[in-house]
Amino acid sequence: MEERGFMSPSLAISASYREGGSKGMSRRRSMRPSFDADNEFMNLLHGSDPVRIELNRLENEVRDKDRELSEGQAEIKALRLSERQREKAVEELTEELGKMAEKLKLIENLLESKNLEIKKINEEKKASMAAQFAAEASLRRVHAAQKDDDMPPIEAILAPLEAELKLSRQEIAKLQDDNKSLDRLTKSKEAALLDAERTVQSALAKASMVDDLQNKNQELMKQIEICQEENRIIDKMHRQKVAEVEKLMQSVRELEEAVLAGGAAANAVRDYQRKFQEMNEERKILERELARAKVNANRVATVVANEWKDSNDKVMPVRQWLEERRFLQGEMQQLRDKLAIADRAAKSEAQLKEKFLLRLRVLEESLKGPTSSSSRGTSVGRSSSNGPTRRQSLGGAETSPKITSNGSLIKRTPSSQLRSLTASASTVLKHAKGTSRSFDGGTRSLDRSKVLINGPRSNFPLNHKSSEGTSRGESPSSIKGEEESADKATNNDSVPGVLYDLLQKEVITLRKAAHEKDQSLRDKDEAIEMLAKKVETLTKAMDVEAKKMRREVAVMGKEVAAMRVVDKGQQDSKTRRLSVSKGNTAQLLSGRVSGRIGMTRSTQ
């Protein structure tokens, strides 16, 4: 009953643990659809693959922990079954021990009764020996008296004495038979006692084993409680991490909405640029049609002028056609040369663009929070003080536009911008120590850099147009109009400072969010490493305890073997003692019998 009472708290703990495990499994099952929805939403997002990978890894770790818990529960069930079997075996052994104890008590009572009988027989032997000695003394006296006096015949005196001797001999034979039977009983009882001692020793060994197993079960229950607490802590950590991931997802959604809003503004700017280019192309077509109309008008004017002139004053239309043909061929050659130059310039500009895009990528990867915050502060200060002017901070390089008398913005030349960009890139690459790559911040900032780089290069086609107009010999008024339209186009092409500041703020917030995500991921990695270390320590402790169990079992086996050897030696010594005592008793009895026979012969 005590053992059952001792095992009841463990069963209660196991029941509570099963309830807790079932609750945890139901919670995990309820959490799995939310995880699936999050994974589907994460697949729809761009640049959130690391978060999804982290969630998958955390789910895999939770599944591994669940498997370990199920294995531990299976081991606990197996241990409980083994404990129940051991309890049954202990109960059976206790019953057998009670039976053997009762048998031992009965055997002890029989031995006491037999010992009392042996004592009585020995006393009777002593009395018979005393009577024998008295009879012998009386015979001697009778013989002595016969010698002296005439006495009755000796036969009359010896007959009753011989009858008594025969009776005493018969009693002695009976007593010897009784002694032999008692010796046999004592041997059988000693063998039964040895068997009982062996069973008692085996029962004691089993009881000690049961005690050891109970202690080990208590230690295992303590370890299970520790593991349960650790699993609870891990569940709390997992919930916190899930909440953090949800917060990060919300921040990513907000950032993507902000980026989409900025992208809409950038798309509007691109639409305006496209419209401006289409208008420039239409203007070129109109200029060509004007030139053709002028040539046709000149031809018609020459024909009309030649109608009223004399034959001598008329101009040969063939010569005029040849001159016009030469003029047009020269213009076509010039246009071809300009096209070749423009192709070369476009190729060189494309190469430079690729180089500067690579440099911008390196710069954006090398830039950190302090540089972005300082550039944001300077740009906000400049925009608040100068109004329409703006400041472009690309890794520390500033490109401030100049203000004309009319209030229009004139940008720097592309060469000066490229030099400033290369200088800023070299300085940032020298001073940058660590890079933190965000999810989509690099590509979005590259798109913004493309817009900024393509902005000042829109001046080139206008300059080419002005050169074409001068080469064709157009009027200076048309050239001035083209320059004014070009200035207006450049002014319309420029991005306002407020939009740029908003985009820059969004980029800074994106970088901060990316940095916070990196830190949270590092913290999660550290926590996972700590949990892995704890699991390793637990496995090592379990291995050490298993080794200790094996060693203790081996030691117990050795002790049992030693006990068996000792029991065999004791049995051999007891058998030797019994054989020696039996030999001594036989010798004594034979000596006594021979003495008595000699006495009877001497008396006869």
Curated annotation (Swiss-Prot):
Q: Which GO terms describe its biological process?
A: cytoskeleton organization
Cellular component aspect of the GO annotation:
cytoplasm; microtubule
What is the disulfide pattern of this chain?
A: none
Gene Ontology terms for molecular function? microtubule binding
Task: Give residue spans, biased composition: Polar residues.
Answer: 401-422, 468-478
Q: Where in the cell is it found?
A: Cytoplasm, Cytoskeleton
Here the segments flagged for biased composition (Low complexity) are 371-385
Q: Give me the ranges of the annotated region Required for targeting to microtubules.
A: 233-470
Q: Where is this region: Disordered?
A: 1-33, 367-422, 434-495
Q: Which is a Pfam family this sequence falls into?
A: MAP70
First-listed, main subcellular location of the protein, grouped into a coarse class:
cytoplasm
Q: Which residues form a coiled coil?
A: 49-351, 521-569
Phosphoprotein in keyword set: no
Q: Keywords assigned by UniProt?
A: Coiled coil, Cytoplasm, Cytoskeleton, Microtubule
The function of this protein is: Plant-specific protein that interact with microtubules.
Family of this protein: Belongs to the MAP70 family.
What is the recorded name of this protein? Microtubule-associated protein 70-4
| Organism of derivation | Arabidopsis thaliana
What's the encoding gene here?
MAP70.4
